């Protein structure tokens, strides 16, 4: 009996979801150990139909726990899908948190377990992943990047920004920040993820990072010369390859700005400062 890996994936009309599932199964050493926990929110029936077809194809190989819900504006927010996915955890041995657009290297399951087993139960392997090319699904970078604090605001105007940086070191592992698109831990991570259910988008990672550290978790990355897992970033999507819905796909520009930069800012500032300093 192989140790089980609970793979939690939220998805929002994402064409890469089924490819991610298939890739994880085909590249794992023991696909029978994988327990996929999926929360699919869809506005297009094709997303549901594609997932149902893949469930029929792979349900006799890996285990699946699936929630499918028709889109409603109240379901928007990264934490909502993640919470539903992680709520189906049932004491599996390991937990892998990813996004629905992820690439896996061969033997990824054994590699991650061997890495994690060198540390205590409150260690999480995380960090910023390199990108992959969706047309043909191949990696476009190696290793795991350090999340480096930068003064300039490159993606969010109202909170500290952390940009990817290659690590030049001989150490086997290095300390890092929590990344929501890649985190691997033991049962301890399954019991407590640190997720803030109020987070809409930008506030998710810094709050989850803080919560985990407050509970005694250590967050590290492997210093490796190969592609372990990769993530599909927005600027690598082209045409139908890697196509996925965004917040602006469902909301007006004004509504999207409210949820991303007013509501979520209040969540962030209220958490870290006790009140929203932007409204003082």
PLM regions and their residue ranges:
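Short, acidic, metal-binding catalytic loop of nucleotide-sugar glycosyltransferases
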Residues: 23-33
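Active-site-proximal specificity loops/subdomain of glycosyltransferases
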Residues: 46-93
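Conserved catalytic core of nucleotide-sugar-dependent glycosyltransferases
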Residues: 72-74, 79-82, 86-87, 94-98, ...
């Amino acid at each position: 009996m192989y140790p089980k890996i609970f793979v939690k994936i939220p998805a929002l009309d994402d064409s890469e979801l089924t490819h991610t599932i298939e890739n994880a199964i085909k590249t794992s050493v023991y696909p029978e150990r994988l327990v996929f926990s999926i929360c699919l929110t869809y506005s297009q029936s094709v997303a549901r139909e594609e997932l149902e077809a893949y469930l029929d194809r792979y349900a006799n190989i890996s285990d699946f726990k699936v929630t499918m819900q028709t889109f409603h504006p109240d379901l928007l927010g990264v934490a909502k899908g993640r919470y539903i996915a992680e709520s189906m955890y049932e004491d599996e041995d390991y937990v892998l948190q990813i996004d629905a657009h992820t690439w896996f290297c061969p033997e990824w399951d054994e590699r991650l377990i061997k890495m994690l087993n060198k540390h205590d139960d409150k260690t999480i392997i995380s960090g910023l992943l390199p990108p992959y090319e969706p047309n043909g699904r191949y990696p476009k970078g190696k290793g795991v990047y350090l999340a480096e604090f930068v003064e300039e605001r490159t993606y969010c105007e109202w909170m500290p920004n952390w940009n990817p940086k290659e690590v030049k070191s001989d150490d086997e592992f290095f300390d890092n920040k929590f990344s929501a698109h890649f985190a691997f831990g033991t049962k301890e991570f399954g019991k407590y993820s640190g997720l803030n259910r109020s987070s809409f988008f930008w506030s998710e990672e810094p709050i989850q990072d803080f919560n985990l550290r407050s509970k005694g978790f250590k967050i590290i990355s492997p210093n490796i010369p190969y592609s372990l897992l990769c993530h599909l970033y927005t600027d690598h999507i082209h045409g139908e390859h890697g196509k996925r819905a965004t917040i602006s796909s469902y909301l007006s520009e004004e509504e999207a700005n409210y949820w991303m930069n007013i509501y979520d800012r209040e969540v962030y500032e209220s958490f870290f400062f006790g009140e929203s300093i932007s409204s003082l």
